[in-house]
Every structure is written in C-alpha cells, then in structure tokens.
Amino acid sequence: MIYHGNRFTIKASATPEQVEAALESLRNQGRVIPSVKSFVVGPDYGGEYHYGAVFAIEDLEGYWEYLVHPAHLNTDRVGLPLVDKFMSFDITDDEDPRMADKIAELHQRRYDTMPDITELVSELGEYSGSAAPASTANSHAADPRPN
C-alpha cells in the first residue's frame, strides 16, 4: 500500500469559496478514483500548513491511475493556482529499494506529458517532496533507510 499525501498553504488572495471548491475537488478524488482505497482531506494541525490530504493507493499501477485521472487533474487545475507552499510525501509498506525512484518516475512522466500541469506546478511559491519535479530544489531527499 502507498499512502500519498500532501500539505499546503493557501494564498491570502484565495476566497473561502475558492478554497472550499478546491477541498471538495480533493474529496471527490477520493470518492471517484478507483485505485484510491481510502482518503482523508482536512485542516493540517501542528505545522506551518493550512490543509492536507492523504490517499491510500494499492500499488504503482494504481498510483499512475490516480495521477492521470480526470478528477485529480481537475484538482490540480482548480487548486494549484490557490496554493503558495506545497509539500508531498509517500509512505509505503512495500520493501522495494527502488520505490522512491519509481514514484518519482511516475510524477516526472506526468510532468513530461502534461505541460499545463507542469506550468501550474512551476508557478507555486515553494514545492518540495516526493511529487516535486526533478528541477525543483530539494525535491527528493536522500533515502533515510539504512543500506
């Protein structure tokens, strides 16, 4: 199982209606994307981020389905223009030592084939973590597991 999560701050210029539309789009992803087994979307407490979401996805094939599903693309198009700071992460019980690279490759393939999404991501104030484009500074931390 892969738990794909993100945490983000909202720009001061975003209206409450825009924010709710983006959050509802995130919730809709969880409801309609077949590979999502469970999800949570809501306020992020205890840190510098305003909101977060976590989606439980069975495997890499399901992860790709999630990334390119129209519901996810809608969230990107509706939500990313409202976001200032974005951080993504993936937690998995899969012991494949290449899992981080495989996840990064899926995200990069999406950026390579969807220029409008890549442009939206490039306009974020800050983007770090497992889903960040390779060109983003500090996008992929070293694997913390012992060799």
Predicted features along the sequence, with ranges:
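Sensory beta-strand/linker motifs that couple input domains to effectors
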Residues: 56
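Short S/T/G/P-rich N-terminal loop/turn motif that feeds into the first structured element of a domain
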Residues: 1-50, 60-65, 84-147
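Mid-chain, well-packed structural core segment of small domains
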Residues: 60-79
